[in-house]
A protein has these predicted regions:
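Non-catalytic beta/alpha edge segments that cap or flank active sites
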Residues: 1-59
Length: 59
């Protein structure tokens, strides 16, 4: 099984906040045999979140 992680938060796009949740989630998914093939970080804009989600689910 494959997975993509989308981290949401404008603070994650600055050099002052690290996205440690994606690292933790990747490790936990790998333990379950799920391979993470892509990670995205997107700000708080609803339009940006929608576009990122669409990109993730389209073939």
């Amino acid at each position: 099984m494959l997975a993509e992680i989308i981290a949401v938060g404008s603070e994650l796009l600055t050099p002052y906040r690290l996205d440690t949740n994606s690292l933790y989630l990747t490790a936990e998914l790998n333990k379950l045999g799920i391979r993470v093939i892509h990670k995205s970080v997107v700000g708080d804009s609803r339009d940006d979140i929608r576009a990122t989600f669409r990109h993730a689910i389209l073939p």
